[in-house]
């Protein structure tokens, strides 16, 4: 039976698995920064997942199916995730960066788009990374199954996208999480903070995450340093981040803020698990599932 969001959030292995997941996303960014930025805010994540699902769902016997501006707009604007103009600009960006291409006559309306090979590979790696988190919770065989049958991506991903675009808890992050996720490249920043959250301070109220160099991070993530500094100031005001002294050599990530983020991410992983189970059936376990009683502090 697929995990609930509550079971995932309370699992003793989840925080560590999520930290490694954030590190894997950072590696994907380093390998393909421009494409990774298409998933780097919550709005772009929703747009990207919906767009990829639509192009997979294309049916030649159904006129108007597939990834078109109209179809993407219907999904996205129905939950107020983006405006019509944002959808248009997003597709234009995908096309200009060659992450999608126009199928058939480019003068014909409506234009239909399909993902290019680099996009397929990126989504495949993204799904593997998500399934690996779930496998680390129960010793399951999700990753092995997808690697053995990569064509399952075409069936599982649309289920994830459709469910995600209908799940209120995923659509609306908690306020402090939204502070990052609704901003440009905020997902990249959040991944960077989470992957550093290894050492708790005495008392366990925060995690030491080292020095935050806004200039360096802004260059790496291809965003304005002013924008990033403003984001960090708001995060400090909201109690997400703090510095123990005036030297600012060692930033602290608030434990309760990390817990909020973990619970929100658990909603997504539950969606992924339910979608996987619907297509692939129950997961085969390779080792006993850890007891869910004692929750690891996050």
Please tell me what each predicted stretch does:
Residues 1-35, 141-162:
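N-terminal leader segment of winged-helix/HTH proteins
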Residues 24-58, 169-200:
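Short alpha-helical segments that sit at the start of domains
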Residues 58-78, 200-220:
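Short acidic, hydrophobic short linear motifs in intrinsically disordered regions
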Residues 81-96, 222-236:
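Short amphipathic alpha-helical interaction segments
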Residues 95-105, 236-246:
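A short, conserved structural fragment
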Residues 107-115, 247-255:
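Minor-groove-contacting beta-hairpin "wing" of winged helix-turn-helix DNA-binding domains
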Residues 118-147, 257-287:
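Short, amphipathic alpha-helical interaction segments positioned at domain boundaries
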Residues 138-199, 284-298:
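Exposed, interaction-prone assembly regions rather than primary DNA-binding/catalytic cores
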